[in-house]
Amino acid sequence: MKKHAIIPIFIPHRGCPNDCVFCNQRKITARTTAPTADEVKNTIDTWLTTLGEVPTVEIAFYGGSFTGLELEEQSSYLAIAKEYKDRGLIDKIHLSTRPDYIDKDILDNLKAYSVDTIELGVQSFDDEVLRKSNRGHTSAAVYEAVSLIKEYGFEFGIQLMIGLPGDSLETCIYSAKETVKLKPSLTRLYPTIVIDDTELLEMYERGEYQPLSREEAITRTAAMYKILDDAGITIMRVGLKSTDIIGEGGSINGGTYHPAFRQLVEGRIARDEIEPQLDRIVDEIRERRDKSCELIANHLQGRDLVNESFNQQRLSRVKVDVFSSPKWFSNAVGNGGENKKYFEEKYPELSIKFRVDDSLEAAQFRINCNT
């Protein structure tokens, strides 16, 4: 049974005066109408009729800088959500905004309307990356916003982007580690894509920006994922959905988009965990076979007999079982079976079977060698 459902309400970026290089919302907003109160209610009612029995239901206001809207407009939307919460029809109210659009007046208003979670579009903790991305604030704004949010007792989340101008593996890891220090309830990881009507597209066309390859994006995101996951932080999303692209109002002109990007990342994490265990097994097998062939060579007469015995040893494949939790079984095999293919090519000595072990946790793997 589904444990958590989100009812998304998209609010255009009319509250955000900034021009981040990756965002085209200021241009889209000119031709996008904000939802009316009736439209918001209809959206919520429609979702509620389809959800069934779900322990936790959230109304989430997406679209960027919700707290950048005029306070009166924020309140009009929040009043609708609070009504559903007061009636017991939903459990939480969630919104996303910029770190520099948090102050005590805003938080007082959010508290009055029973908001639970504030998600901050941090994108990076590296000031040079923020500057090159024209974010309009430094990392100091993040620390200040989080301090205030904690003071008021809200849950908070952090969104990070991978592959912004000036970004690197080192700055990505730094951002993940700084996130851990702040102890958010949730995170989202988004590889940068280049969409229409953005400064980033112009930079790309001028040769001033190079999007990450898929391999680079997977490597960096996997490194960040492991840091956050090891700290026990919930990773709500990895990569954009196709509906996110539509919501952003543009087609992709560069960067990493894959409908199953999370599985690509989790599959890489699985491979990185399984591979050293298989390496050790293969090293032991090769060592045993070398010793076996040496013993055979000492007892057999003639080069042909020795070579024949050696080749038989080489052709004998060792059966190995790779166990994972049910939830991570597909990640062990890899998206499209890519991990399975990778291991088969790297370890011709092994006959590998992927199996489920209910006792294992997510991202835990056990190897059984049937020698």
What are these regions (language model features)?
Residues 28-42, 63-218:
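Conserved non-cysteine loop/helix-boundary elements of the Radical SAM core domain that shape
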Residues 52-56, 87-90, 287, 313-317:
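Short helix-terminating capping/connector loops at secondary-structure junctions
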Residues 12-15, 190-195, 241-242:
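Short glycine-enriched loops at secondary-structure junctions
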Residues 57, 91, 116, 185, ...:
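Short acidic/polar active-site loop segments enriched in Thr and Asp
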Residues 2-5, 207-371:
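Auxiliary Fe-S-binding modules of radical SAM enzymes
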Residues 43-50, 80-84, 109, 148, ...:
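A generic secondary-structure signal
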